[in-house]
Amino acid sequence: MSFKMDREEYAQHYGPTVGDSVRLGDTNLFATIEKDFTVYGQESKFGGGKVLRDGMGVSATETRDNPSVVDTIITGATIIDYTGIIKADIGIRDGKIVAIGRGGNPDTMDNVDFVVGASTEAIAAEGLIVTAGGIDLHVHYISADLPEFGMDNGITTLFGGGTGPADGSNATTCTPGKFHITRMLQAVDDMPANFGFLAKGVGSETEVVEEQIKAGAAGIKTHEDWGATYAGIDNSLKVADKYDVSFAVHTDSLNEGGFMENTLESFQGRTVHTFHTEGSGGGHAPDIMVFAGKENILPSSTNPTNPYTTNAIGELLDMVMVCHHLDPKIPEDVSFAESRVRKQTVAAEDVLHDMGALSIMTSDAMAMGRVGEVVMRCWQLADKMKAQRGPLEGDSEFNDNNRIKRYVAKYTINPAITNGIADYIGSVEVGKFADLVIWEPAQFGAKPKLVLKGGMLTYGVMGDAGSSLPTPQPRIMRKLYGAYGQAVHKTNITFVSQYAYDHGIKEEIGLNKIVLPVKNTRNLTKRDMKLNDYAPKTIRIDPQTFDVFIDDELVTCEPIHTTSLSQRYFLF
């Protein structure tokens, strides 16, 4: 005889199911469950008197020798991913996602996708949201505290460059030369996050870049502060093509070595990741945004201008002066900074993100952006755009799935594809490393509840360790066991070039982390950017007013005075 529950009571016990909507934080965005892989009446729920007990939902006979037995089950999770918004159990084994569906005991339950046994830990995610760990492709390695601050907002992978607070690193995301690349690879070996390093892309000979790729760099970055010249770009792209690594560029704001059209010519149709495609962080003034319409360009922008608020413009000038080693006493330096701060392109940036023309959200950490705000600002922007532009096509009341999937892709799968690491991370899919972030819906986008790295709890909200329970205050994000000892080496990845991987870079310089090669970076186009592949036919920036036109229509939006995910969640 069946037992009936109303939807509200069911959601309280087992989490939302098909057709139910979940509000994301204090935004006006609602995620609607598209498919539920659990079975009503046979949900795998942990706890006293619940299903996951010996001989019931837990197999009494299966050992870990059975490859279907998982190390961890995440039960009843609401998964938000570019692939869909679903309800399912997640099975993790050997640090990877091995199943998304229904976990339990095949002796007592029908149609089980993976087995819960004596070897299995349980994380109860009924009513919670699970996303892939965030990937920030634009990090200045200035402070060694960056990984922890990133984890505080769900960022588990950092790509960028630097050597600490050297002026070159304060300004550019390049780790120059074999010495610095080697020492930085060794420096992050005990840090609980995934890392990749970008070589300095300069020079009129390919050898000066090539030696850095052989030393273990996972990509190349050309930056105007080191010189974004035609020859430097062309030679860097030749090396990128030869070794299958990504190429990123921060173009010439001063238009000294050439204009936007000259830089575009230097690309010669080759795949390029453009940083600061809006322009306030740097790049051809005032028309770098034209790059967002080119098929061979994978465009990203940075979080200090997202979303466009009444205070956004005010902080940019000082940030430019500090980051790029400019002198406020020199008029030319001030003019250089002022040329980059254009409210018209900042306003258009929001809209281009919402249209899917800007494909990736990054931080520009410590050099005009904040590593701990990538995820938060992405959802603030999505919320602002819904309020100003209305639902996306296919969305409806209490169902913003199309917009939600577009925005989650900006900091998960698209950066993974761009830098050649999508086979390993970037989405909640079977076969990928279990770099997962678990959120309470009310805190979504602001503060994670738990962060898993390689299937192990590494960061999370935790109370006073001297108390009788895990819940007493102060409940703050703290390092968990996955952030210590040899566990760090078994659950985190250092990404290098295929050449360095094949030639034993791990053994050569004594790395302990998992070392993996980047791949499949050189034949990408805008069409490979999931749910963010719109390439407008024409983007035009008026050189006098800086107004932005797409296909001859003005693109702009108003700044907002307050944002979601802000003072309700943070004191400062």
Curated annotation (Swiss-Prot):
GO terms for molecular function: nickel cation binding; urease activity. The active site is at 324 (proton donor). It is found in: Cytoplasm. It catalyses: urea + 2 H2O + H(+) = hydrogencarbonate + 2 NH4(+). Residues 133-572 form the Urease domain. The modification N6-carboxylysine is found at residue 221. Its EC number is 3.5.1.5. Keywords: Cytoplasm, Hydrolase, Metal-binding, Nickel. Ni(2+) 2 binds at residues 221, 250, 276. The keyword tRNA-binding does not apply. Ni(2+) 1 binds at residues 138, 140, 221, 364. It comes from the Bacteria. GO terms for biological process: urea catabolic process. Carboxylation allows a single lysine to coordinate two nickel ions. InterPro entries: Amidohydro-rel, Metal-dep_hydrolase_composite, Metal_Hydrolase, Urease_alpha_N_dom, Urease_alpha_subunit, Urease_AS, Urease_asu, Urease_asu_c. PANTHER family: UREASE (PTHR43440:SF1). Heterotrimer of UreA (gamma), UreB (beta) and UreC (alpha) subunits. Three heterotrimers associate to form the active enzyme. Belongs to the metallo-dependent hydrolases superfamily. Urease alpha subunit family. This is Urease subunit alpha. The lineage of its organism: Bacteria, Bacillati, Bacillota, Bacilli, Lactobacillales. The gene is ureC.
